[in-house]
A protein has these predicted regions:
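Alpha-helical elements of the RecA-like P-loop NTPase motor core of helicases
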Residues: 7, 33-37, 107
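A general structural motif
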Residues: 22-24
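A generic short alpha-helical patch detector that favors 3-5-residue windows
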Residues: 1-5, 27, 48-51, 63-67, ...
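Conserved beta-strand -> loop -> alpha-helix junction used to position metal-binding or nucleic-acid-contacting
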Residues: 26-33, 38-76
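Active-site beta-loop-alpha junctions of metal-dependent nucleic acid enzymes
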Residues: 1-20
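Acidic/histidine-rich catalytic cores and adjacent linkers
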Residues: 77-198
Length: 198
């Protein structure tokens, strides 16, 4: 619908930037064309990571039933590769193995492969958590769970207050609780890369 349009995403990202969002280097999301176009325009220079879970579902949905287990094993191997080159090599082996048996699935995977392995450019420590949208999906599930308890909101402002309170609660958890990941090593890695290339 309209809530998924390029213009809607563009306005949202512009508002986030206007409110001070800076230093975006990697964005993990589903593959909605409008979303991806808006991301690339508003966060130029940031890498885009296509959610591997969503791509895997798309590929498996186009895979013949008798090949699904084999395809799933190949996808796990590709997505858990140590490097982009290794992932590409594994895809080449898969394409040779299933040539003529799962063409639609292979075409979908080939079209999305580079975007789904963008995370392999990062240090291994960060890949598992950044390769999917699981963190955001869990947050959305929690919002929906709490919303179902209330069931009927008297007005949209009350719904916004609930969502705002839940997001604030999650923000505080990220600040004070167990860290989802520590970015200090990432910034050291980035600085070392900059020094070696400059």
């Amino acid at each position: 619908g309209d809530s998924e349009s390029e213009g809607t995403w563009e306005r949202l990202f512009k508002r986030l930037r206007d409110r001070g969002l800076r230093g975006v280097e990697l964005i993990t999301s589903d593959h909605h064309h409008g979303l991806v176009k808006a991301l690339r325009r508003q966060f130029q220079g940031a890498a885009w990571q296509r959610c591997q879970t969503h791509l895997m579902r798309n590929v498996l949905g186009q895979t013949p039933r008798h090949l699904k287990a084999e395809m799933a094993a190949w996808l796990r191997r590709i997505f858990r590769s140590e490097s982009k080159a290794e992932a590409r090599q594994a895809f080449g082996e898969l394409a040779g193995e299933l040539d003529g048996k799962a063409e639609s699935a292979l075409q979908t995977l080939e079209a999305g492969l580079e975007d789904a392995i963008a995370v392999l450019a990062l240090p291994a420590k960060y890949r598992r958590r950044l390769r999917t949208t699981n963190m955001v999906e869990r947050l959305i599930e929690e919002i929906r769970r709490r919303e179902r308890v209330i069931r009927i909101f008297p007005n949209s402002a009350s719904a916004h207050r609930l969502v705002g309170a839940l997001l604030q609660e999650q923000h505080e958890e990220w600040l004070t609780g167990r860290k989802y990941f520590d970015m200090s090593e990432y910034f050291e890695w980035k600085q070392a890369r900059r020094a070696s290339s400059g």
